[in-house]
Amino acid sequence: MFTLKKSLLLLFFLGTINLSLCEQERDAEEERRDGTDESDVEVEKRFLPALAGIAGLLGKIFGK
C-alpha cells in the first residue's frame, strides 16, 4: 500500500510539473503573437507614406 501511495504521489508531482511547463509555453506563444501585431502596425506605418509618395510621383508624371 505504501508503494502505491508513493507511485501516485510521484505521478501527481510529475503531472503538475508538466502542466506548469505547458502553461509557460502557451503564455510565451501568446506574447509572441501579441508582439507580431505591433510590428505589423509599424510596417504599415512605414509602407503607407511610401505608397502615397509613389502615387503622387506617378500623378505628376502622367498629369503632364
From Swiss-Prot:
**A single BP term in Gene Ontology:** innate immune response
**What residue stretch is flagged as signal peptide?**
1-22
Query: What's an example GO cellular component term for this entry?
Result: membrane
* Propeptide segment residues: 23-46
* Keyword terms of this UniProt record: Amidation, Amphibian defense peptide, Antibiotic, Antimicrobial, Cleavage on pair of basic residues, Cytolysis, Fungicide, Hemolysis, Immunity, Innate immunity, Membrane, Secreted, Signal, Target cell membrane, Target membrane
Q: Which residues carry this modification: Phenylalanine amide?
A: 62
Q: Does the keyword Signal apply?
A: yes
Q: Could you tell me where this protein is found in the cell?
A: Secreted; Target cell membrane
Report the function annotation for this chain.
Non-amphipathic mildly cationic alpha-helical antimicrobial peptide with potent activity against Gram-positive and Gram-negative bacteria, and some fungi, as well as against Trypanosoma and Leishmania (both promastigote and amastigote forms). Strongly and selectively perturbs anionic bilayer membranes by interacting with the polar head groups and acyl region of the phospholipids, with formation of regions of two coexisting phases, one phase rich in peptide and the other lipid-rich. Shows low hemolytic activity and a low toxicity for human monocytes THP-1 and THP-1-derived macrophages.
Q: Which family does it belong to?
A: Belongs to the frog skin active peptide (FSAP) family. Temporin subfamily.
Kindly provide the name given to this protein in its UniProt entry.
Temporin-SHe
